[in-house]
């Protein structure tokens, strides 16, 4: 088993808002949405390339690319399937490129040229560059705290030459390492974990995430490749079958707010996504949900809850496979401090993901933080158990 310590940073959305001042400006303009509403031009297949909102991604770990390894911080993202990092050849006008580590193929003895161009479409522009092949080490430099790393040979990844807009400039991470199914991989590139399985580098084809919800705690969490660790959860794991092998998609029976409201009535589909920090659902249903927890709209789909009311709010229960996964108001109300004031943001956000991929609910870090999550590629299922409070 390989353990990768995860570090928690303030999300870009919060960092930007701190730069912008006032709570009203909390929400960055025009979020870069991974679940883009349009159908991208590139993909002729049946799957729209739903793209993602990294404004809130908060958990990162380190990987190495090349020989000797060049280190990068990446978001280990179960809601996408490609690996990309900034390239040394990025455009001068690409400011995001100035603020991050860049891959230099000249410095790697294991680099193999590919050169195919790639585009990943986002709500606010597209990320583009070309593909290259090299060795990927996870973690970058195995240390005493995370011994035993793994080296994946011949991994194809994207060297980003152009990154859109202001979003990536403020990002604390250099790139993204996608851990979803190959089916949603841009250019049909084999994802890192698939390559790892083919090269038989782990005993079991599973990986699991522990995300520490205590913002001050270090490490911020742990990604484990090839197994699970019972010190991170209580009780036993319950497994839920993947219903469509693209995202880590499972069936959700319903979602209840106390005893006053049920949404996703009659069942719906949900994806478990480590690269999204909130719980996201269809706009109309989330609007009702926010009303039921007394949240008031901010802007761009986010809502605020008066902090003094948090302790008296109802539990929210996600029902999966007949089992109740409860979230207390402390789990779903996020405290954000700014200068002298602390505001509480609702951990739910509305966004409509169009067919054929959608409609979908997204169970992001708010959910995964409370429930230790195991992603099982051998049996195509997601395991959940209550996370231990370390």
From Swiss-Prot:
It comes from the Eukaryota. N- and O-glycosylated. Undergoes proteolytic cleavage and activation by ADAM30. Disulfide bonds join 71-140, 90-97, 264-268, 307-344. Pfam families: A1_Propeptide, Asp. The active site is at 77, 273. One of its GO terms (molecular function) is aspartic-type endopeptidase activity. It is an enzyme of class 3 (hydrolase). It is found in: Lysosome; Melanosome; Secreted, Extracellular space. It catalyses: Specificity similar to, but narrower than, that of pepsin A. Does not cleave the 4-Gln-|-His-5 bond in B chain of insulin. One of its GO terms (cellular component) is lysosome. Residues 1-44 form a propeptide. The keyword Hydrolase applies. GO terms for biological process: proteolysis. Its main location: other. Belongs to the peptidase A1 family. Acid protease active in intracellular protein breakdown. Plays a role in APP processing following cleavage and activation by ADAM30 which leads to APP degradation. Consists of a light chain and a heavy chain. Interacts with ADAM30; this leads to activation of CTSD. Interacts with GRN; stabilizes CTSD; increases its proteolytic activity. This is Cathepsin D. It comes from Bos taurus (Bovine). The gene is CTSD.
């Amino acid at each position: 088993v390989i353990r990768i310590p995860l570090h928690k940073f303030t999300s870009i959305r919060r960092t930007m808002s701190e730069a912008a001042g006032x709570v009203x400006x909390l929400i960055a303009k025009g979020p870069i949405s991974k679940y883009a509403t349009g159908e991208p031009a590139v993909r002729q297949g049946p799957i729209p390339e739903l793209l993602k909102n990294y404004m809130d991604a908060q958990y990162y770990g380190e990987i190495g690319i090349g020989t000797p390894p060049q280190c990068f911080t990446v978001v280990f993202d179960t809601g996408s399937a490609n690996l990309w990092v900034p390239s040394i050849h990025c455009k001068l006008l690409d400011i995001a490129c100035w603020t991050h580590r860049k891959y230099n193929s000249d410095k790697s003895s294991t680099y193999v040229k590919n050169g195919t161009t790639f585009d990943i479409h986002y709500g606010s522009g597209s990320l583009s560059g070309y593909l290259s092949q090299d060795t990927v080490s996870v973690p970058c430099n195995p240390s005493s705290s995370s011994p035993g790393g793994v080296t994946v040979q011949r991994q194809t990844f994207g060297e980003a030459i152009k990154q859109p807009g202001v979003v990536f400039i403020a990002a604390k991470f250099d790139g993204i390492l996608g851990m979803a199914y190959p089916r949603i991989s841009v250019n049909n590139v084999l994802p890192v974990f698939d390559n790892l399985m083919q090269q038989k580098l782990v005993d079991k084809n599973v990986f699991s995430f522990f995300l520490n919800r205590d913002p001050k705690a270090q490490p911020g969490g742990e990604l484990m490749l090839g197994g699970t660790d019972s010190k991170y959860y209580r009780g036993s794991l319950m497994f839920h079958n993947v219903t469509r092998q693209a995202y880590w998609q499972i069936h959700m029976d319903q979602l209840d707010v106390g005893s006053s409201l049920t949404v996703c009535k009659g069942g719906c589909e949900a994806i478990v996504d480590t690269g999204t920090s909130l719980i996201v659902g269809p706009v109309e249903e989330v609007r009702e949900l926010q009303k039921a927890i007394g949240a008031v709209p901010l802007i761009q789909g986010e809502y605020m809850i008066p902090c003094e009311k948090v302790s008296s709010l109802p539990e929210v229960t996600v029902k999966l496979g007949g089992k109740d996964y409860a979230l207390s108001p402390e789990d779903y109300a996020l405290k954000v401090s700014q200068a002298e004031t602390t505001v509480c943001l609702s951990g739910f956000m509305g966004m409509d993901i169009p067919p054929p991929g959608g409609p979908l609910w997204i169970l992001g870090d708010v959910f995964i933080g409370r429930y230790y999550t195991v992603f099982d590629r051998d049996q195509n299922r997601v395991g959940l158990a209550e996370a231990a409070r370390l």
